[in-house]
From Swiss-Prot:
Keyword Phosphoprotein carried by entry: no
Organism name: Enterococcus faecalis (strain ATCC 47077 / OG1RF)
Pathway(s) annotated for this protein in UniProt: Pyrimidine metabolism; UMP biosynthesis via de novo pathway; orotate from (S)-dihydroorotate (NAD(+) route): step 1/1
Name of this chain's protein: Dihydroorotate dehydrogenase B (NAD(+)), electron transfer subunit
Presence of keyword Cytoplasm: no
Keyword terms, alphabetized: 2Fe-2S, Electron transport, FAD, Flavoprotein, Iron, Iron-sulfur, Metal-binding, Pyrimidine biosynthesis, Transport
Disulfide bonds: none
Superkingdom of origin organism: Bacteria
NCBIfam families noted in UniProt: PRK00054.1-2, PRK00054.1-4
Listed cofactors: [2Fe-2S] cluster; FAD
InterPro entries found in the cross-reference section: Cbr1-like_FAD-bd_dom, Cyt_c3_hydrogenase_gsu, Dihydroorotate_DH_ele_sf, Dihydroorotate_DH_Fe-S-bd, Dihydroorotate_DHASE_ETsu, FAD-bd_FR_type, FNR_nucleotide-bd, PyrK_electron_transfer
Quaternary context: Heterotetramer of 2 PyrK and 2 PyrD type B subunits.
């Protein structure tokens, strides 16, 4: 995997929902962005904030050498990003991570795409690429409330889409686990499952598909270096009774088969 660093230029930025921002960047690094589910590590342009921030890639446009990121303002670093304007530059390291494996599904087959909250953005590029292969995509997307929901129309344009909110203000009342359970009860069995979101959601998916060979989970561990050097983002492997075997989410992931890791 190629890993490069570049000062990329901000092309546009806008707010999608409370604390949710869409950031478009332009630069040569985009040439190396190919697999959905990869991320970049962004240096905060402030001297007292040393650690880079990992943000997943939402869309890739090779023809214009642009990529789109969607992030949520969580602290001082992302607060700085939210104030930046078109024409300014950011120090970007990437692309990082292994990305989703889309080779296991073929045209005419069905993929469930499951996302929650800020885990939703990388699934858009995934859905686009699966569509291009002729795979039928069915989206299951969960939000805290209607107020913080975003990208509904974009996903609906790519395929069948089901929504859920914690408070019932939009879509089904509850989480995406409920939506998946209802789909399975109707006999809808996917050829592959792709998911990104909070650990609780991923655990629910793991329990719903305990023996499925093609369930891919994007883990949201905290990352410091982004290149596998600091061991801050490790998780343990299934089948390891010693507890000594682990994988580095930033370098060997962030996507793993559900059968590989302990959530």
């Amino acid at each position: 995997m190629q890993r490069k660093q570049e000062m990329m230029t901000i092309v546009a930025q806008k707010q999608l929902a409370p604390r949710i921002y869409q950031l478009d960047l332009q630069g040569e690094l985009v040439k190396d962005m190919t697999r959905p589910g990869q991320f970049v590590h962004i240096k905060v342009p402030r001297a007292d904030l040393l650690l880079r921030r990992p943000i997943s890639i939402n869309q890739i446009d090779h023809s214009n050498e642009t990529c789109r990121l969607i992030y949520r303002v969580e602290g001082a670093g992302t607060e700085v990003f939210a104030t930046m304007k078109a024409g300014e530059q950011l120090d970007i390291l990437g692309p990082l991570g292994n990305g989703f494996d889309i080779t296991t599904v073929a045209a005419g087959q069905t993929a469930f795409i499951v996302g929650g909250g800020i885990g939703i953005p990388p699934l858009y590029e995934l859905s686009k690429q699966l569509n291009e292969k002729g795979v039928k995509v069915i989206h299951f997307l969960g939000y805290a409330s209607k107020e913080v929901a975003y990208y509904q129309q974009e996903f609906m344009a790519l395929g069948e889409t089901h929504f859920a909110t914690d408070d019932g203000s939009f879509g089904a009342h509850g989480n995406v686990g409920r939506l998946l359970s209802e789909a399975l009860a109707k006999g809808r069995i996917p050829d592959a499952v792709y998911a990104c979101g909070a650990n609780g959601m991923l655990k629910a998916i793991d329990s719903l598909f305990p023996t499925h060979p093609h369930v891919y989970l994007s883990l949201e561990e905290r990352m410091a270096c982004g290149i596998g050097a600091c061991y801050a983002c490790v998780c343990h492997k299934k089948g390891d009774t010693t507890g000594a075997k682990s994988v580095k989410v930033c370098d060997e992931g962030p996507i793993f088969k559900a059968s590989e890791v302990i959530l």
